[in-house]
Every structure is written in structure tokens, then in C-alpha cells.
Amino acid sequence: MLLVAFKDPRITRIAKVNLIGGQAKPGPQLASIGINMGEFTKQFNDQTKDKNGEVIPCIITAFKDKSFTFEIKTTPVTMLLKKAANIKVGAKNSKTETVATISREKALEIAKTKLVDTNANDEEAVLRMVAGSAKQMGIKIEGVDPVVHKDGKKK
């Protein structure tokens, strides 16, 4: 999408920003994109009011006439894992420290949420991606080994 969009001469900028759902405000992060910030924040907050307080990635396409389009992505895996594990930060040393454990069901729920934003074909593949992120944060997922591949071999 991004490469095709730059062929359109009306586009001035494509930016990826992380905003708080339902709480976006005009500011320097949006000013540099060159869009009508008031209109953008109104539309963004309306579309993300059900995700109030969550970090929401958003891809904004700005046009020469100050108009814009935007695409809302799903919340980052790290945020979803912290929420599921009920923690504020991950482990300082994830190789030796485990800060929380979550159930396979919670991890699968996160994988289903992220399935639309990945290039994976099935939930199990996304579950392994989620498990890898969890491992880096010091979060253990019951019954999931992030280093076992489909063929059963360990990395």
C-alpha cells in the first residue's frame, strides 16, 4: 500500500504514529504531518472511543490540499501482553527473569486480534509470534514453547 501510494502526486506524506485511543489531541506529532489536526483528532477519537486509553498505531496519508485518510491498526502485542498479564513493564533480563504467566487461551485471544495485521495464514503461526514477544518481555505462556517450529524441531 505504501509504495503504490507514493506514485500518486497528490500525496505529500505518509506517516505512522502511535496515539492513545479516544484521547488524541492536536500537537507536534500531528503538526509535522501537515493535516487539519482538529478534524483528524475528532475522527480518530470517534473511531477509537471503544479502545479508550490503549496505544493505537495509525497510518496517516496526507494530501496536498490538507485532506487526509487514515488506517487504524491493532494495539501492539506488547501492550496486549502487559494488559493480559496485568503488569506495567516487562522483565529487565528476560533470559533469567519471568515477571508473569498467562494462559494459552489469553495468548490465543491476542493472536486472533493480531491476525489481521500480520502476514501469517493461521492463528497458530501468530500465536508463536505472540509467544516470542512474550518471551522477550519475560512473560511465560502456559503450554506454548516459542522456539518449537511447525516441523517439531527446536531452534
Swiss-Prot record:
Q: Which NCBIfam families match?
A: L11_bact (TIGR01632)
The primary gene name is: rplK
The signal peptide, as residue positions, is none
- Keywords in alphabetical order: Methylation, Ribonucleoprotein, Ribosomal protein, RNA-binding, rRNA-binding
Specify the protein name: Large ribosomal subunit protein uL11
Q: What is this protein's function? A: Forms part of the ribosomal stalk which helps the ribosome interact with GTP-bound translation factors.
Entry's Gene Ontology cellular component terms:
cytosolic large ribosomal subunit
- Gene3D superfamilies, from UniProt? Ribosomal protein L11, C-terminal domain (1.10.10.250), Ribosomal protein L11/L12, N-terminal domain (3.30.1550.10)
Q: How is it modified after translation?
A: One or more lysine residues are methylated.
Q: Cite the record's note on assembly.
A: Part of the ribosomal stalk of the 50S ribosomal subunit. Interacts with L10 and the large rRNA to form the base of the stalk. L10 forms an elongated spine to which L12 dimers bind in a sequential fashion forming a multimeric L10(L12)X complex.
The Swiss-Prot or TrEMBL record describes its family as follows: Belongs to the universal ribosomal protein uL11 family.
**A Gene Ontology molecular function term of the record:** structural constituent of ribosome
Q: What's one GO BP annotation on this UniProt entry?
A: translation
Write down the superkingdom of origin.
Answer: Bacteria
Q: Which Pfam families match?
A: Ribosomal_L11, Ribosomal_L11_N
SMART domains per the UniProt record, alphabetical: RL11
- Name the species this protein comes from: Malacoplasma penetrans (strain HF-2) (Mycoplasma penetrans)
